[in-house]
C-alpha cells in the first residue's frame, strides 16, 4: 500500500474569532499545535508514504520547522495554499503529479484531510487507504445526532424533514485512487467548478464511481469555533487515560 496524504491547513478560521495573523491549526491542544497532532497520525499510519501540507504562505516556515523538529520524516513539502480549500488541495495535487513524472512512481491512493481534525487515528487512516484502493473511493462519516431539516422556499421557515436514518455527516480523510482524484480536480479546474469536499468533485465528474462509507465515532471533530477547544482538550485527555 502506497498512499499519499494531503493535509489542507490554509483556512483563516473566521468562526474561531482569531486575531489577524493567527491560525487555528497552530492553536495548542495539550501543549502541541492542532496541526502537530494531525500530522503525527499520518506519520504513524503504515499505509502513508508521503505527506503534503497546504497552508498560508506566512505559516510555511513554522510548519516546516515543526515537522523537522518533531521528526515527521514523511512530510515531503509544505506548499502555499490557494484562495479556497479546493485550490489548496489542487496545488498539492500538482506537486504530486510533478513527483510522479520525476520519479515514475504512482501512489495507489491519495487521502485528503482537514488540518483542523487532530484526532483521526493511524489505524483509521490505514482502513480508509485500503478501502479507497479496493472500491476506488472511501469517505468517513458519522450518524447525525440531531434532526436535520431543509429550509423552505421562504428562508425564514422550515421545509420538509429528510429521514435521519439516510443521512450521514461527512468527515475526512477522504480517500481516492490516485488517477480518479487527479482527473476530478483537473476537470473542476477546467470548468471552474467548486465543491465543499473532494467527494463532491468525484460525484459530479465520475457519477458512476461508488463511494464507500466508512462509519466512525464522534471523536474526529474539526476545530471550527472557540467552543471546540475545550471539547478537543477533553477528547485528548480521555484518550490519554486509555493509553
Question: What do the predicted segments below correspond to?
Answer:
Residues 1-61:
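N-terminal glycine-rich phosphate-binding loop and ensuing alpha1 helix
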Residues 7, 35, 92, 114, ...:
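Residue-level signal for inorganic ion chemistry
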Residues 16, 63-67, 128, 148, ...:
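Hydrophobic packing residues within well-ordered alpha-helices of enzyme cores
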Residues 36-107, 189-191:
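Conserved N-terminal catalytic core of the sugar/cofactor nucleotidyltransferase
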Residues 49-50, 136-137, 210:
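Residues at the starts of beta-strands that form the adenosine-phosphate
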Residues 83-152, 171:
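Conserved beta-loop-beta/alpha segment of the NTase-like Rossmann-fold superfamily
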Residues 150-176:
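Short, flexible, basic/aromatic active-site loop/helix in glycosyltransferases
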Residues 168-243:
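Conserved alpha/beta core of the MobA/IspD/sugar-nucleotide pyrophosphorylase nucleotidyltransferase superfamily
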Amino acid at each position: 500500500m502506497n498512499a499519499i496524504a494531503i493535509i489542507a491547513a490554509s483556512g483563516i478560521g473566521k468562526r474561531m474569532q482569531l486575531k489577524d495573523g493567527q491560525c487555528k491549526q497552530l492553536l495548542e491542544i495539550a501543549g502541541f499545535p492542532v496541526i502537530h497532532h494531525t500530522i503525527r497520525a499520518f506519520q504513524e499510519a503504515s499505509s502513508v508514504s508521503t505527506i503534503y501540507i497546504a497552508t498560508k504562505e506566512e505559516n510555511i516556515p513554522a510548519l516546516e520547522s515543526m515537522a523537522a523538529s518533531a521528526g515527521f520524516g514523511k512530510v515531503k513539502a509544505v506548499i502555499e495554499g490557494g484562495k479556497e480549500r479546493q485550490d489548496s488541495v489542487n496545488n498539492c495535487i500538482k506537486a504530486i503529479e510533478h513527483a510522479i513524472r520525476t520519479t515514475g512512481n504512482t501512489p495507489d491512493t491519495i487521502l485528503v484531510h482537514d488540518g483542523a481534525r487532530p484526532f483521526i487515528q493511524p489505524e483509521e487512516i490505514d482502513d480508509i487507504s485500503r478501502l479507497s484502493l479496493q472500491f476506488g473511493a472511501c469517505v468517513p462519516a458519522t450518524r447525525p445526532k440531531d434532526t436535520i431539516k431543509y429550509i423552505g422556499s421562504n428562508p425564514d421557515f422550515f421545509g420538509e424533514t429528510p429521514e435521519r436514518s439516510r443521512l450521514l455527516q461527512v468527515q475526512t480523510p477522504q480517500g481516492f485512487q490516485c488517477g480518479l482524484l487527479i482527473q476530478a480536480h483537473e476537470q473542476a479546474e477546467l470548468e471552474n467548478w467548486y465543491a465543499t469536499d473532494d467527494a463532491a468533485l468525484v460525484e459530479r465528474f465520475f457519477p458512476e464511481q461508488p463511494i464507500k462509507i466508512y462509519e466512525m465515532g464522534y471523536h474526529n471533530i474539526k476545530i471550527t469555533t472557540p467552543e471546540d477547544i475545550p471539547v478537543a482538550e477533553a477528547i485528548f485527555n480521555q484518550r490519554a487515560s486509555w493509553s
